[in-house]
Amino acid sequence: MPNAVANASGSPWVGRRWIVTTASVLVMLFALLALVARDEARASWLQARYFTRQASQLTTELGAGPSDRIRFPGDGPHDRRFGYSRLPAALQAASEQGFRITAQVRVSEPFAALVDRGVSPIFREKTQAGLRILDRHGATLFVSRYPERVYSSLDSVPPLVWQTLLFLENRALLDPRFPNHNPSVDWPRMAQAGTALALSWLGSARSVPGASTLATQLEKLRHSTEGRTRSAREKLLQMEAAALRGYLSGENTESVRRQIVVDYLNSVPLAAIAGHGEVTGLNDGLRVWYGADPDQLNRLLASDSAPVARRAIAYRQVLTLLLAHRRPSYLLLQEDGRTELRRLTDQHLRRLAREGIISTELRDAALTVDLTLRSRAPDVPRVAFSERKGADAVRAELLRVTGVATLYDLDRFDLTVRTTLDLRAQEEVANLLARLTDPASRVLDRGDPTRVIYAVVVRERTQNGNMVRVQVDNVDSPFNVNEGSKLQFGSTAKLRTLITYLEIVEQLYLRNAGRPAVNLRADPVGADDWITAWTLAYLAANPGVSLDRILEAAMSRPYSASPNDSLTGGDSHMFRNVDTTDDDQTLSVRDAFVRSVNLPFIRIMRDIVRYYMYRLPGSVYLLRGHPAELTWDHDHRMADDEGRELIEQFYQKYTDANAGPVLETLRRGRSVTQLAWAYRSVTPEAGLAEFGHFFQPLSDARIAELYDSSDPIGLSISDRGGLAGMHPLELWVAAYLYRHPRALQQDVIDASAAVRQELLDQRSAHARPATPDRRIGSIPEMEAFREIHRAWQRLGYPFESLKPSYATAIGSSADRPDDLTELVGILLNDGIRYPVQRVEELHFAAGTPYETLLRRSPPHGERVLSSEIAAVVRTAMVAGVTRGTARRAFGAVRAADGSPVLIGAKTGTGDNRFRMKGRDGLVSEDRAIDRTATVVFFIGDRFYGTITAFVSGAAADRYDFTSALPLQILKMLGPTLEALMTDLTSEPCRSAHPYGQMDRAPPSRDTCRSPQ
C-alpha cells in the first residue's frame, strides 16, 4: 500500500501539475512586473522619487568674492549665445581692465561632480536674455532681448499651436492622468524605436523613428555642440539632464511639462537670415521669415471665429517652421529645401486632419496657400542713433572690458550693466539739442539750424574716479562726435599752449631754484630763448621764490599783440587778432588768455619752440657775434641715437607697406603742394601720367603746374623734406620702403647711415645760415614740435602729431571734445589723471549657476601736472568767465541759495578754410572747410565738460556763429546741471576745497557738494 502511494505521488501527472503551477506563478509574476513597468513608464512613481532626491542636492549659493567652486557649461548654442560658456574669458578680460569680482556663485559638491561627468548644469533656465544697460539710478538706457518675442506661458500659446507641436514631437507629454510623469523619456516611443533599430540591423528597410522627447531635444538644442547629438553616451547624458531638470521643483511635473512646451517653442532654431542674424523661437521666426505680426497671428489662431482663409495662412506659416527645425538651413534657405518643405507641409496637413488635430476645412484651405519665405528680415523701427549715443558709448567700452568681439554677440549676453550716465540729464540735453535745430529756436543769426551738429559731454569728479554723466550729440548715425571727431576749435588750443608754457617755467625753476644769483646770471642763454632768459633772471632777482609765485609772475609776462612782425613756424602764415583794437597793445599772458588774443599766443608758441630747439640732442646755441648763430654738434651719438630713433619711428609708420599704402600714407595731413613734393621725391621715375592719376580729380592744368614746380632734382634731402612738410628722414624711409616693401627694420637703419650723415653735415655747414627760403621747413623746429607733441600727449592730446606751425597755438593741429574734457578733468583733480568711467558694475548671468558680479576697482591716479600749475590755470579759466570771452557763462548755474556757482571756461571758434595762392601771390581759391565753436568748462569742484557746435563743408560759409553759441547752450543747460549737482547718489570728492590737494583723505559728502 505504501508503495502504491509512492508511485502515485511520483506519477507524471503530479510532475506536470508542479510545472504548470510554477509556470503560472512566473506568468503572473511577469504580468505583474509588466503591469508595474507599464504603470511606472506612465506614472513614473519610482523615477520621480529618485530624480527628485538627486535634484535636491544640486544647489547653488551666491557668496562674496570669487568662488572656489563654480562650473561653467560647454559650448552649446544656448550657452554660447547667452555668454555662459564665454564667461571665464570675459571675467579675465574684465579683471585686466580694473574690475574685481565682488560676488559669485558657489555650487554644491554633487552639482560640481555632475557637471564634471559631462551633464549640463541643472537649473531653471532662461528662455530670453540679453544685454541691459542701466543708468546710475537703475533706469534703463538700453535693452536687448533675445529672442525678441517669446511666449510667456502655455496659456499665451494658441492651443492649435501646442497641440500641433505635441502631435509632431511628444504626444503624451501633457497627459493629465500622470502628474509625476518623467518628461525625459517616452517609453512606448523608445520601445518602438528600439524594435525598428533591431529590425534595421537584420536588414529591414523601414526607417527608424526618433524617440527623443521635447525635454531631451531641448537639452540637445541648448547644450550640445552645434545643437547635435554625436554619440549614444551624449544622448544618455541629455536624458539624465532632462530628467533632473524635470524634477527640480519636486515629484509633480505638471507645471514643468507645460513649461517645456513653451521653452521649446521659444528655443526652436530656425537658421539665420540677412538683416537679423540667427533666428531662434517660433515668434521671431514668424516675423523674420514671413514678415508676420506674431501677436496678431497668435490671436488669429486662438480664435475659432476668425475667417478660415486667414487662419489657414497663419497655420501653414506655423507648421512650416515647426517642421523646418529638423534641417533649418536646408529647408529655409535653399531652393530645393524650400520645395521639400512645401511637400512636408502638405503631407502633415493631411495627417493632422486624419488624427483630428485640425478640421478638414482648415486642412483644405491651408493646402491651397502658397507661402513665400523671405530672403531678408523685414525692417524694424529703429531708435535714432542720436538718442542712444551714451548707451552706444557704453556698449563700445563693454567690448573692450569683456573682450567680446562684436556688438551682435555682446547684445545677446545675459548681462546687466550699471553705468555712470544719468538718464534724466541725457534726455534733457538730447531734447535741448533737438530744439536747437528747429528754425523757431532762433539761436543762429543766419544759416540753416538743421545742419548744425551739437555735442555735449559732462563728467563728475568723484572718489571713485571721473564719471561720465552726459554724453550726447545730435548726429543720427553711429559716429560719436565727442569721441571720434577731429576738429579745429581755435582758441581752446591756447589752454594746452598755456600749460606747456608754464611747464617750461616749472622745469627751469626746479633745475635752478636755490642756485646763487651770480651763477644764474653767468649761464649762457640763447639770445632768443626768452623763456629761459626770463626765468633765470627772475630767480636771480628773487632768491627763495616759491613755485606758485614764479608761475604767477610768468602769467604777468608781457607779449605784443601786433600782427605786423614776421612770424613763421614750419610754414608761412599771416596771423591776425579777432579784435583789431588789440593790434597795438601789449598784454600779459594772463590777459591774453582771458581775452583770447591770438598774436601773444603765437609769440608764446614761438618761444616754446625755441626753448625746445636749444635742448635737442646734438645741438647747442652759441653766441658768436650774432644772436641767432647756430652750430650743430654732429658727433656719433647724434648719428647713432637720434637718427636711429627717428628711423625706427618712421619704419613703424610705414612698415609692411607696399607701394600703394606708402603713397596713401603720404596723403594724410598734407597740402596739395606738399604732397606733390613728397610724391615726386618718393617716386622720382614717375612721369606726368602717373602723377596725374595720383592727383585726380585736379584739372590737367593744375596737375601740370604741380608736376613742373615739384621737380626734386638738385635739391638736398633736407630741402625736399621741408618742401614736403615732413622730416627728411621720414621722406627717405617712405622712398626706401616704396622700393623695398619687405625690408626689415635693421636693414632700413643700416641703409640710412649715409643720409643721416648727410643731414648732420648740412647742419654743421650751415652754422651761419643765410636768410632761409620760407617754404623750407626747419629740421630743429620740427623736432621741437615733436617734443611739444609729447608734452601734449601726456595730458591726453589724441592725435599722432602736431602741425609744425606756430598756428598750433590757436588751433591748427585740431583736438577732440572728449580729450579737451579730459584735460580739464586733470586740472580739476589738481594735476592727477584719473580713469574716465562709464561702467561701474557688471552683473553676469543673474539667477544662474554662473552668476557673477563685478565692480570697478578703486582708481589709481597718475600725476601728469603739478598742483601749482593746475591751480594757476584754473584761476585763469575762472577769470575767463568773470571778465573774458566766456562772460556769458557767469551765473549759468546757481546754488540752492541762488548764488552763482564758480565756473571756469575756455572758449574757441574755428573758421577753417582752404586758401590757395597763384603765382602772382593773390588768392586763387578760398573755400570753407568747417566752422566750429566750443567751450570747455568746469563748474564748482565736481563737474566739467565740453559743449561743441560745428558745420562741415562748403555750407559753413553760410554761418557766422562763434563760441557765444555753446556758451548760450551752457546757460540753457543750467537747470539740468543744477539737478546733477544736488543729486545725492554721487560719491564724495577727494578734496574739500576745489583747488586743494587731491591726495588728502576724502571730505564729508556735504562739504564736497558745496562748490566754492
Question: At which residue positions do the language-model features occur?
Answer:
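Active-site SXXK
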Residues: 160-171, 352, 429, 489-513, ...
